[in-house]
Amino acid sequence: VFLQAVLEKEDVHVCVMDSPRSEFKAYAVEERVDYCTTEEDVFEFFKGLLPEFKRRNVLKNQMLEQEKEEDEILDRMMQETPYFIFISDLSWFVPFIYKATLDMKGFLENVLEKGRLHNIYFISELDMKNKSNLMGYKIYESFVSYKTGIHFGGKTAENTLFSFDYMSYTEQNKPEKVGVGQLPNAMDKDSAKKVVVPRARR
């Protein structure tokens, strides 16, 4: 649903990095999507992203030197064309990058560590059952350090990446309906705590 919503925007760069399970194969024929499945595909995409990331990073650092506030930096970066990079399965992607013959882990580590406020976004799915296999990888640690996302399936107590302290113990151990996601750190009583994805129920 998020991917489809992004494609409705006119000026946007979209990339899909799909695992061998081909969960996003429907987008392989989408002209506006860079659909990557092989090591060579992924390497070429990041090779093309490198100069753009460097340019934006220089701009960000210049604004930091000018003691600009984060809101000002973000406002400026929002004038740049956004990049949305969708990864079908983080538990596949991280080992894939580190085992690749073509070296791209250094660049990706740098992007995820320093890429905040660049208007470049990485979106991925992760089954909590596979989380332990990724611990220790710098790409994974940087990815989850942002503490942003949506937890689907209920039983939020099993998710140690996000904080759901605003929920009671009982609520944190309840399963949830298909398509209903829980937002972390929704401490403000007026903030949204759940999202509903209607299409996921079909």
Task: State where each predicted segment sits.
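Phosphate-binding and hydrolysis-coupling loops of NTP-dependent motor/remodeling domains
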Residues: 137-202
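P-loop NTPase catalytic phosphate-binding loop
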Residues: 1-65, 75-157, 170-171
